[in-house]
Amino acid sequence: MKILVAFAVIMLVSAQVLAAEIGLNDEPEWYSDQIQEDLPVFENFLQRIARKPSPDRFYGLMGKRNNGFGQMSRKRSAERNTIHNYERRRK
């Protein structure tokens, strides 16, 4: 049991020493941060608009496409197609 405690203490001490050596840099090294600082406010606004997808290209949860019908079973989908075809014939 003493060996396990000694091993745990050694691991914790080594983790603290290695974490202190690595440290955090205060300089911004991220590419996206540098781009955001360089762009004027108006171009930043236009860039956000360009990134925003239109509602017809919106992907819902789990990557499923949103086609406006929601989640339907095959039976309901077949019923909807039958009703749609019936209405088309009546016209």
From Swiss-Prot:
InterPro entries: Tachy_Neuro_lke_CS (IPR013055), Tachykinin_fam (IPR008216). GO terms for cellular component: extracellular region. Transmembrane segments: none annotated. Residues 1-19 form the signal peptide. Residues 20-51, 66-91 form a propeptide. Residues 76-91 have a biased composition (Basic and acidic residues). Expressed by the skin glands. The modification Methionine amide is found at residue 62. GO terms for biological process: defense response; neuropeptide signaling pathway; tachykinin receptor signaling pathway. Residues 64-91 are annotated as: Disordered. It is found in: Secreted. Keywords: Amidation, Amphibian defense peptide, Cleavage on pair of basic residues, Neuropeptide, Secreted, Signal. Belongs to the tachykinin family. Tachykinins are active peptides which excite neurons, evoke behavioral responses, are potent vasodilators and secretagogues, and contract (directly or indirectly) many smooth muscles. In vitro, induces contraction of guinea pig ileum smooth muscle in a dose-dependent manner. This is Tachykinin-like peptide. It comes from Theloderma corticale (Kwangsi warty tree frog).
